[in-house]
UniProtKB/Swiss-Prot annotation:
One of its GO terms (cellular component) is cytoplasm. This is Small ribosomal subunit protein bS16. The keyword Ribonucleoprotein applies. InterPro entries: Ribosomal_bS16, Ribosomal_bS16_CS, Ribosomal_bS16_dom_sf. GO terms for molecular function: structural constituent of ribosome. GO terms for biological process: translation. SUPFAM superfamilies: Ribosomal protein S16. The lineage of its organism: Bacteria, Bacillati, Bacillota, Bacilli, Bacillales. Keywords: Ribonucleoprotein, Ribosomal protein. The gene is rpsP. It comes from the Bacteria. Belongs to the bacterial ribosomal protein bS16 family.
Amino acid sequence: MAVKIRLKRMGAKKSPFYRIVVADSRSPRDGRFIETVGTYNPLAKPAEVKIDEELALKWLQTGAKPSDTVRNLFSKEGIMEKFHNAKQSK
């Protein structure tokens, strides 16, 4: 099972917000998911990002691949740097 960390679209038409979820890569974008890692609201000024850092690192170490957008969000929050440092120290 290929696991990805990606965005699940929520909210009304023309006013989206997203949940950052861990899901099987074969499941639909807004379909079945394994676990919620955080939220992302691009409409707030500045954009609002809330991520459970421990959960995100756990899934990254398990082998889940983040989507491009999630990778950028994780980088801005410093999670990718912590993941790479933990990987290098082993």
